[in-house]
Amino acid sequence: MSNLFREVGLHAGLGRTLTLIGNPRFWKQLILLLHQATPFDNALAIFYPLDGPPRALEEYDAEPSSKPASMLTYLNGLYLLDPFFQACREGYPSGLYRLEEVAPDHFRQSEYFLSYFHDNVLEDEVQLILQLPEAGTLSLSLGSQRVFSHDEIGLLTTFSAWVLPLMEQHWQHSQARPQGPAPQEMASQIRDALS
């Protein structure tokens, strides 16, 4: 019986997500839907344009803490060392990728791991990468304090068959709307919130 209620909850969450396509709240709802199906500790929806710095679209922490300064560090250039960013730039096809598929050898000794990943993403990461021809890349990162299980990766791989098209539809609809704050404005908003 509990599986039935879990399935009902997932379908209801998917319905809510569909109604928010083109709405700024889409990313939060999509993240909550995925969190309902597979446990993870943090998530980041981000757009990497072909030129210029990335734009954070939604940040989620299952257990909120005060780490906005780390996001500023990431957006102000540390993203260049992110193996997922590099995978996006190298033209990996749209899909779900595990950290071990994109990280270089000795990743855990890298500057990026030591200065950002270990404290913010934690232990493991998967990303849903959507290539947007002539625009850039949309990415939805899911981070965990533990390694994702084979079952969780299988479920996320199955979900990617509809998550990626939803991300693409949302992107197309949201381009008709005025854009959110630029990275510099977001950085200013984060600094203001901390003071």
Outline where the language-model segments fall.
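Signal-transducing coiled-coil/dimerization helices and immediately adjacent hinge/linker segments
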Residues: 169-195
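Regulatory input/activation interfaces that engage signals or partners
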Residues: 2-5, 9-147, 161
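Amphipathic alpha-helical "output/dimerization" segments
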Residues: 148-165
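Inter-helical turn/loop segments and adjacent helix faces that build the functional surface
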Residues: 144-151, 170-174
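Alpha-helix capping at helix-to-loop junctions
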Residues: 118-122, 165, 169-172
